[in-house]
């Protein structure tokens, strides 16, 4: 066996969709998992005693949030270089993600990591610097491009990836998308949570509300257009259970996302050559957690009617379609060619 063959055999490929709210991972050995993009630290000595370790990552940290200092290292889908502390939090998350993929001691770890479509060069460089500490080779690519690659939709397609921190929109034209082919909006899932919390409190000021409750309402009832059911949810008021109809607040919050998304789709549609635009309209694909919004495809199709008859679809697996595309890219394209696609660290 040659040295090259030995290296290939010991390579572990990872597709990582690093999100503001959740991180999804798939490996070339069949490992597949989702965790909250959160790190928890004890608030005081009592918290340290309860936790029994210096920090905890993911869903476990979120469940212990009553006595932990909860940190989300990703803001609007990118790492924020505010202080050494912020960088340390991000490092703890990334280290945990790679460790959870269960690499062997002699593995060469090669990871493709998704970032928002218009992430800055500084943010990409910071992520790659951190990745270099835990993997041998890392490539950062735009999240909607990862989705398109996984779906074999790389030409005459517009991908709209609605995450928690950002909505990323990408025009795929048969080449690696450039900045002019992509849009990043900061109105996404977290924005809906905030709008929904405010809209509910405007109508029901007696309810005890926070963004976690608003998120639970959104995940159960989110819709745009005409409602198909009453959004009746059990809240708390003065500590007692109270059921309230929040159908209208849910509609208002979810539809608040739509104008910027529609405008961005229209702008990117016009960037295609005119002879391809009718074909592009047949390939509008929504991905990410926001693609679960009921009535989304029909709503967007109607808004795009002035441009022609559109075919709008939502991916079947919004949780893992991004990292699945990243893993497929990692496996199909040898790491020595990754620099042709984007920013790379390592070999």
Swiss-Prot record:
The keyword GTP-binding applies. Induction: Constitutively expressed, levels remain the same over 144 hours of growth (at protein level). Expressed during exponential phase in static growth conditions. Expressed during late exponential phase in the presence and absence of the mamK-like gene. Part of the probable 18 gene mamAB operon. Its EC number is 3.6.1.-. It is a peripheral membrane protein. It comes from the Bacteria. GO terms for biological process: magnetosome assembly. InterPro entries: Actin, ATPase_NBD, MreB_MamK-like. Protein with ATPase activity which forms dynamic cytoplasmic filaments (probably with paralog MamK-like) that organize magnetosomes into long chains running parallel to the long axis of the cell. Turnover of MamK filaments is probably promoted by MamK-like, which provides a monomer pool. Forms twisted filaments in the presence of ATP or GTP. Serves to close gaps between magnetosomes in the chain. Interaction with MCP10 is involved in controlling the response to magnetic fields, possibly by controlling flagellar rotation. Domains close around the active site upon filament formation, which probably enhances nucleotide hydrolysis. Nucleotide-binding also probably induces domain movement. Forms cytoplasmic filaments. Filaments are parallel (polar) and double-helical. MamK subunits from each of the two strands are juxtaposed, each monomer binds ADP. At cell poles and septa interacts with methyl-accepting chemotaxis protein Amb0944 (MCP10). Forms filaments with MamK-like protein. Belongs to the FtsA/MreB family. MamK subfamily. NCBIfam families: MamK. This is Actin-like protein MamK. The gene is mamK.
């Amino acid at each position: 066996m040659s040295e090259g063959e030995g290296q290939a055999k010991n390579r572990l490929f990872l597709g990582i969709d690093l999100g503001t709210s959740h991180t999804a991972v798939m490996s070339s050995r069949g490992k597949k998992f989702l965790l909250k993009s959160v790190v928890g630290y004890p608030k005081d000595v009592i918290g340290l005693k309860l936790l029994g370790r210096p920090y905890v990552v993911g869903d476990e940290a979120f469940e212990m949030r009553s006595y932990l200092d909860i940190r989300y290292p990703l803001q609007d889908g990118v790492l924020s270089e505010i202080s050494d502390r912020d960088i340390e939090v991000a490092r703890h998350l990334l280290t945990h993600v790679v460790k959870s993929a269960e690499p062997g001691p002699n593995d060469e770890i090669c990871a493709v990591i998704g970032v928002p479509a218009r992430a800055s060069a500084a943010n990409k460089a910071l992520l790659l610097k951190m990745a270099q500490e835990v993997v041998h080779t890392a490539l950062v690519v735009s999240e909607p491009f990862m989705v398109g690659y996984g779906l074999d939709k790389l030409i005459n397609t517009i991908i709209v990836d609605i995450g928690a921190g950002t909505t990323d929109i990408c025009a795929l034209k048969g080449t690696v998308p450039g900045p002019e082919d992509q849009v990043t909006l900061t109105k996404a899932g977290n924005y809906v949570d905030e709008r929904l919390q405010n809209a509910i409190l405007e109508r029901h000021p007696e309810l005890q509300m926070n963004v976690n409750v608003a998120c639970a309402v959104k995940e159960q009832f989110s819709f745009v257009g005409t409602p198909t059911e009453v959004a009746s949810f059990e809240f708390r008021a003065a500590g007692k259970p109270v059921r309230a109809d929040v159908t209208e607040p849910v509609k208002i919050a979810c539809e608040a996302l739509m104008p910027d998304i529609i405008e961005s789709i229209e702008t990117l549609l016009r960037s295609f050559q005119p002879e391809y635009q009718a074909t592009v309209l047949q390939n509008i694909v929504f991905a990410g957690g926001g693609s679960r919004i009921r009535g989304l495809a029909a709503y967007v199709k109607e808004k795009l009617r002035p441009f022609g008859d559109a075919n709008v679809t939502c991916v079947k697996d919004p949780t893992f379609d991004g990292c699945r595309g990243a893993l497929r890219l990692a496996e199909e394209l040898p790491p020595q060619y990754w620099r042709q696609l984007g920013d790379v660290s390592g070999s």
